[in-house]
Regions:
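Active-site acidic catalytic loop and adjacent metal/ATP-binding pocket
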Residues: 482-496, 606, 644, 698-788
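Intrinsically disordered, low-complexity domain-flanking/linker segments in eukaryotic proteins
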Residues: 359-361, 365-381, 546-598, 657-664, ...
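ATP-dependent phospho-/nucleotidyl transfer catalytic cores
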Residues: 622-631, 658-733
Length: 890
């Protein structure tokens, strides 16, 4: 019992328990007391005040060593053998030529004039910011925040083996005055991420406070950025390894799935070491491994940055695949399928810093042994490579971008590959970043082009653009037009007044059906004379781009008939090969039911050229519009969405039966693909919701299956009163992607403000605030409520006034069928017909994380205990509209 008591009182155990809970942190003198208090498991005067029990005769060397590490002092540690150079008054040219991208350096006199030198003492910080909460760095995924005065109290009381420390990237928001106390040193003022808006750019600056024994374990800075760190108080001990030499005992995880090769390094090389003193700034180049240990209580500020020296490395790290990521960090150990046998019998040594000319000997990947400032092979260890192809057998590791780019996985493409979660910014943000750099920094276009080729394969897609342009006699792109635009899922170029979109997302089968369905949709619009044609782009050309024998060629196609090129490269087995639009809507529905995934990348891509629409993308101008303007826009959207949902479906072909056993024979064929998809997601609903990474409260995940109908066909099938016959609703065309970046808004100059005139009819409304809807590549059929989800959550941002204005001009019932009277009668007694319930079900089962938008817009719903609460707050207005909405004549 005594042993169990001792082990159960271990502080790391209680610390882990507390950190798993998260929240606001107030230290009670020990982690056990702090955790029990946080969980309300003891009163202030009971367990917390009891004296610790002592047991004679119990010994544990393991626990003693831990205890020793918790109470040891480092303040007298002053060893520094000068591995890292110290320099004062470096010019920018000297820094760039001698150190930037080459090796670390300690810099003095950069912070002499900072107010922080005097204002960032612990006493003054507590006086000025004691009540401000800061983020705490720790291993738990839970967020820990703490008032500064409470953290200082923790520092004074704690004896943790690995103490918590403040590592806050949001300090500029919680304590903006801190930003005025320092300025970025002149050597590091170039940061190519600064073309992004603050909300778009990755975390880049941190305010750091840590006690003795705290610090950061071995790591490479995110995205292969470089960093500077200025110490204001205390002393820090740094250890560093150059790129490709993994510290002993460190395992690098780089998986093929998320880009993040398990590599256990055999190296026992001694690192570069230095002690950083108050007022000194250390520069850590891109790709360098480093760890930090606080010898005293320290206060520091650090920033990561992208400049011309590391730009290509940052872009390379964003490229799809994992091999190059591993090589950048672990050297040739990361080459897949290669084994490395360490040749030992060499004494351990140190790395010496020779920044100007790293010799081939020093660049060679080494194991147990020394790297000395010498060219003698006899002084260095080496590796023998077993089963290595001849091209790598005698390779010498280099951090040069030409060497590293050899390890890119050529078959992977930016637009068709999974984006690594370890990348510092998102996939779409990366394209936006490169585009902004291209426009705003024309003097760097040579460098930016190289980076874009690495990150997003821009050379490949530009070659595609050139072939399409030549085929259709389009003007040549200007220098400003050479990079893709927009944040969509496919490469899009704007050349003069033309928009060229190359469909790459989802593989050839998916993209070919997307193009075929879009062309069929346009054909239907013209046949029925829909007014929607005035609010969508005009198609100029379409077809397929084929790559064979090292050359691109185009095959024009208008959607009608099966192109020979598909039969050669992708022999689709289609039920509609002889129909007018063989890759149209019904073929797309069948393709979706088959669930067939692309087995490999094929050298063929559909494309479409449209006339560039006049107007501004709504996402870019929404913040400049008045509420009245937004109401007019919502009303215009209602009119155009009505036009989309009223468009008749193509002539129905006989659809093969889906494999989903939950899809009944009696279900209408046009609904079977929708029902099959919804049932498939419902059957894995907990896993589906868990994929959103903590977005959805756990209590709601547990209740999702109970909330959803047992059969998803219940959302479109109702029982008519009287004889009990089933009544089915009609599906509608669904745009599927009505987001703020797919809406263009245009002011009428002669009308002045959008609010100057009250519209009296549809014509006046369109003249007042004309909108255009773009990107119909995700067209499908289904419940028209599905289009309302992105509209309300993304375009309207949950604004109920905009939703009501939209519904006021939409003027269509949500449920339509052969007999709207029968539909109206049958829904009176059906829970599943309630508009708010159906909308909530579609949100839960959505293939995008729309629930993140809901819990972001209505933060109070993070504490909801039932889906009904969420449904009523977000979607209740739909029920009032449904009860009063007009019915169309049968």
């Amino acid at each position: 019992c005594s042993v169990m008591y001792i082990l159960c009182n271990e502080e790391p155990l209680w610390m882990s328990k507390y950190l798993s809970v998260g929240g606001h942190f107030e230290y009670k003198g020990s982690w056990k007391k702090t955790t029990l208090s946080r969980l309300n498991l003891c009163s202030e005067n009971s367990e917390l005040e009891q004296k610790a029990r002592h047991f004679d005769g119990f010994n544990s060397l393991y626990l003693y060593r831990r205890w020793y590490r918790c109470f040891t002092t480092l303040s007298s540690y002053s060893f520094d053998n000068g591995h890292v150079e110290r320099k004062d008054d470096l010019s920018l040219d000297h820094f760039r030529s001698q150190y930037d991208g080459k090796g670390p350096v300690l810099l003095g006199k950069l912070a002499e004039s900072w107010p922080a030198r005097t204002k960032w003492s612990m006493q003054q910080l507590v006086h000025d910011y004691g009540e401000v909460t800061f983020r705490i760095s720790q291993r738990s995924p839970k967020k820990i925040i703490m008032k500064l005065k409470d953290y200082v109290s923790y520092m004074e009381l704690q004896h943790d083996e690995d103490p918590l420390y403040i590592f806050d990237d949001k300090f500029g928001e919680s304590a903006p005055a801190l930003l005025e106390d320092y300025r970025v040193p002149h050597l590091f003022q170039e940061d190519l991420f600064d073309v992004l808006d603050y909300e778009q750019r990755p975390a880049f600056r941190w305010f750091i406070i840590g006690p003795e024994r705290s610090g950061a374990s071995w790591h490479v800075d995110p995205g292969l950025t470089s960093a500077w760190n200025t110490l204001l108080c205390g002393r820090k001990r740094w250890a560093l390894y150059p790129p490709g030499r993994v510290p002993g005992g460190v395992t690098v995880h780089v998986s093929a799935e998320d880009g993040d090769v398990d590599i256990e390094t055999p190296t026992s090389l001694q690192p570069l070491e230095c002690t950083q003193l108050p007022g000194e700034t250390i520069f850590v180049p891109s790709g360098w491994w480093h760890c930090v240990l606080n010898l005293e209580t320290t206060v520091a500020v650090t920033q990561n940055f992208v400049n011309q020296s590391n730009f290509e490395h940052v872009c390379l790290d964003m490229a799809p695949g994992h091999c190059h990521k591993g090589v950048c960090r672990a050297g040739l150990l990361a080459v897949p399928g290669k084994s490395v046998r360490d040749i030992e019998n060499h004494p351990p040594g140190t790395i010496t810093s020779n920044h100007n000319d790293m010799t081939c000997t020093e660049e060679r990947l080494k194991g147990s042994g020394s790297v000395r400032d010498s060219n003698s092979e006899s002084q260095c260890s080496s590796f023998e490579f077993s089963d290595v192809d001849k091209s790598l057998e005698n390779q010498v590791f280099s951090y040069d971008i030409g060497f590293l780019s050899q390890f890119l996985e050529k078959e992977k493409d930016h637009y068709t590959s999974v984006w690594s979660p370890t990348n510092p910014i998102g996939q779409r943000e990366a394209r936006e970043w490169l585009r902004r750099l291209w426009v705003l920094k024309p003097e760097l276009r040579g460098l930016i082009w190289k980076g874009a080729c690495l990150a997003i394969n821009v050379d490949k897609w530009y070659a595609c653009l050139e072939e399409i342009r030549a085929c259709h006699s389009l003007p040549a792109p200007s220098e400003d037009e050479k990079l893709p635009v927009g944040t969509g899922s496919n490469p899009v170029f704007i050349v003069s007044d033309n928009v060229i979109k190359i469909n790459a997302e989802g593989g050839l089968g998916y993209s070919a059906h997307g193009l075929g369905t879009e062309l069929e949709f346009y054909d239907l619009l013209r046949k029925v004379g829909s007014p929607l044609v005035n609010h969508i782009p005009e198609i100029i050309a379409s077809g397929f781009l084929v790559y064979e024998d090292g050359v691109y060629r185009t095959v024009p196609w208008n959607g009608k008939g099966m192109p020979d090129v598909l039969a050669k490269y992708y022999p689709l087995e289609l039920s509609y090969a002889n129909s007018c639009f063989p890759l149209g809507l019904w073929s797309k529905q069948q393709f979706g039911m088959d669930g067939s995934a692309e087995s490999s990348n094929r050298p063929i891509w559909p494309y479409m050229v449209t006339r560039k629409c006049k107007g501004d993308i709504f996402a870019h101008v929404r913040d400049t519009l008045s509420k009245a303007d937004l109401l007019n826009l919502a009303s215009s959207l209602g009119v155009q969405m009505r036009n989309i949902h009223l468009l008749p479906l193509p002539h129905e072909e006989s659809l093969p039966e889906p494999e989903d056993n939950n899809v009944k024979d009696s279900d209408p064929p046009e609904w079977k693909q929708v029902i099959s998809t919804l049932n498939r997601r419902k059957n894995n609903i907990k896993k589906h919701l868990a994929n959103w990474g903590g977005t959805v409260p756990t209590v709601l995940i547990e209740k999702a299956e109970e909330y959803l109908p047992p059969d998803m066909s219940s959302l479109i099938k109702f029982v008519k009163d009287g004889d009990g016959d089933s009544v089915y609703t009609f599906p509608s065309w669904i745009h599927s992607d009505i987001m703020d970046d797919n809406i263009l808004t245009q002011r009428a100059p002669e009308m002045g403000s959008l609010t100057d005139t009250k519209s009296t009819g549809d014509g006046d409304l369109e003249k007042l605030n004309e909108i255009l809807i773009i990107d119909f590549s995700d067209l499908s059929i289904g419940d028209p409520l599905c289009d309302l989800i992105p509209l309300h959550l993304d375009v309207f941002r949950g604004d109920i006034d905009l939703l009501r204005e939209y519904l006021g001009s939409y003027q269509l019932p949500f449920l339509r069928g052969k007999s709207n009277d029968d539909i109206y009668k049958s829904v009176q007694n059906s829970k599943f017909s309630t508009a708010s319930y159906r909308a909530m079900c579609y949100c839960i089962l959505h293939d995008d994380n729309v629930l993140a938008a809901i819990f972001g817009l209505w933060k109070e719903l993070r504490n909801a205990t039932s889906w009904e609460e969420v449904e009523h707050l977000v979607w209740d207005d739909l029920n009032r509209y449904q009860q009063s909405s007009p019915t169309l004549s049968s």
